[in-house]
Design a protein with these regions (language model features):
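Basic polyanion-binding and macromolecular-assembly surfaces
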Residues: 2-150
């Protein structure tokens, strides 16, 4: 899995937070502590990745069951680990290009270019997934199947 990149520039904000619970002895008299938190109001990231069927067959033993477990993990990775530091992170779409042969039927970059993400909110900053339109061009080479897992 490659590093994800934001679709649009992101703008971090800094907010001040007050903690009512005392975290150390020197703050006992104050009864609270102040802190700062960096947030990004909204961002949509695109990540791309690869599974080498050839290596799985010859070296790693990575199976179809392992792959299905991986897809399930990607889809649900933030569902059972909510945190204020991550806000409402969630997977929104999972497009898989499945090749008919272990060495592939098409170069990956050509397939990744088939997934397009466009802003629909005009000049306003995006604030939700609804501010984007995701399309998948289904005109793909023979031997490749498009699967939308999410």
């Amino acid at each position: 899995l490659n590093f994800a990149r934001s679709i649009d520039p992101i703008f971090q904000q800094e907010v001040t937070i007050t903690r009512q619970a005392v975290a150390n002895e020197r703050d006992i008299e104050k009864g609270q502590t102040m802190g700062k938190k960096q947030i990004v109001p909204y961002a949509l990231y695109l990540a791309e990745g690869y599974v080498s069927a050839h290596l799985a067959q010859k070296t790693t033993g990575f199976s179809e069951d392992d792959l299905e477990l991986f897809w399930e993990g990607l889809i649900n990775m933030f569902e059972h680990d909510h945190s204020a530091s991550r806000g409402k992170l969630s997977a929104r779409k999972l497009v898989v290009f499945k090749h008919g042969t272990a060495l592939g039927c098409c170069q990956s970059h050509l397939l990744f270019d088939k997934v397009r993400v466009e802003r629909t909110s005009g000049d306003m900053p995006p604030r939700s997934f609804g501010d984007y339109h995701v399309t998948v061009d289904r005109d793909i080479p023979a031997g490749v199947e498009v699967l939308e897992k999410l």
